């Protein structure tokens, strides 16, 4: 008879207990959203040794490779809350601004659920340009001079008597497309008609701002009340076409860091813009808890605020989070729980990403075009608007993919990403090849 090794029962029981304990300690996370930003968040969470299960609602074809996608839309707040309860979700992370402004964080917290994201009251810093401008005016935070109008005739009279170019901003949420910079009175009149008479973004007000000059940069911070923890800088490319031409979009590419912004401007922005606005929101009874995004401009008079967002930027997140070495679950938990923030550690490698968008974007466009991705090793491909039908990857949004390269230099990151972009096969995508032109 062959000899049989009998595993010692005591040792076996101990190993079972250790495995079971480790499994029980693994966290379940729900990410809300279905774009490239959420793909980058899921990607970062998947690298956490603490996270065992990730759900994403609704997700996309790329996210489905890392998480279980849930067929719930971002504004199905009651259903998302019930899902989190039923599936014993330890932490929910909200990507888009729309559910935040609709109060999803308030609903979850009232139900005793842990969530990363600001209250509806705090989300007004993005959901209402007029609220943000008035807050900055009350607390002496540097920004462009402005006036707010709800009446077309009053707005047109004010604008035509002023200087051009001028900046016109729809007061509410407009998916990053509610800003127009007319260079002539005729362009301004048409834009005001579109916003105030035709209500192209819905009924609302228009903020008229002075036109500032200088390079823009994105400064995102993790904020928990008065605790403001900065991330590395990035720079977005808003215009649709090369040479910074065409209409504004949600963003056609980004890179990180931003060498044209000196450390003294970063320090000024943190001490005189980001920290003061966080303190202002605490003072006014709507403390911020989540990611505060400062869209800033380096003007001849120093950094000034162009806009605030109440969440991770998109496409900035796709070039910032790949550089984060700290366990992002610890970061999200610290903000959600009001506990001490871990020290953030960043990779010295730099990143640059190119957005591939459907032809016609940011206007009308067609969906459902097949996409063939090349063998990918040295770059990250974040899905922004994709779906998988019968095993075929297809376009499903305005912005479809973001290809992010990393390297020791921005030129190296640029070249790696652009090579992959040029090898992606799809009949209905366009991209800007000049991402990073200010620093290359």
Region locations from a protein language model:
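Short, Lys/Arg-enriched N-terminal segments with co-localized hydrophobic residues
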Residues: 9-25
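ATP-binding N-terminal substructure of ATP-dependent carboxylate-amine bond-forming enzymes
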Residues: 23-120
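Short acidic-hydrophobic, aromatic-tinged amphipathic segments that line or gate anion-handling sites
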Residues: 69-75, 147-151, 182
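A conserved helix-loop-beta module that forms one wall/lid of the active-site cleft
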Residues: 118-178
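Internal nucleotide-binding/catalytic subdomain
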Residues: 178-315
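Active-site "cap" helix and flanking loop/linker of ATP-utilizing ligase/carboxylase catalytic domains
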Residues: 270-292, 309-378
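Peripheral (often C-terminal) accessory segments that flank ATP-dependent C-N-forming ligase machineries
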Residues: 333-440
